[in-house]
Amino acid sequence: ESIRFVLSKNPEDIRGEVGKALQFYKRNFEKPDDIDMFNRMDKKSPMEPVLYNIIKQTPFYKENEGKIEIIPQFDIGKYIKQLNPLAQIPDYRNDFLLIYRNDFGKTTMVILEYDGFEHHFKDTGFVNDTNFDKFYVAEDIERRKTIESYGYPFIRLNKFLLDDAVTYLNDRLERYCKKKL
């Protein structure tokens, strides 16, 4: 079975419910499939596919899939420099950029990172699930604050959050993407 659309104008130029439906089909048709997403992830990071699957398990994602775009290995530093050539930001690359477009045309972009224990924490012998946020290496704190200073919310996940990662991530996505206009 298949559906074929022959249009005389772009789906974005069609208003009303028909326009929304056509735009939904267009976004989903253009959206990369999971295999393409996995191929674009960092092969040296075994947790990126895990984070991607956690994103897809959240109620927020399931309810808004047609309004969400996920970009793996996003060069946020280069992107910010394109928008503002005077920006003083290193060429940061993040695990994922999640773009959410609400029904009113507002776009929210959120940076998502999985922090591996051995690379992102200092004094690892003292780190546990109650204090991990105090043991991030200085570079990670600076990176997060720099990116947030340009208006991009930053969500970090790590091994201490995996037991309830779907709920944790869902709460933050709801907070950043569904905040009142």
What does each model-identified segment do?
Residues 1-181:
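Nucleic-acid endo/exonuclease domains
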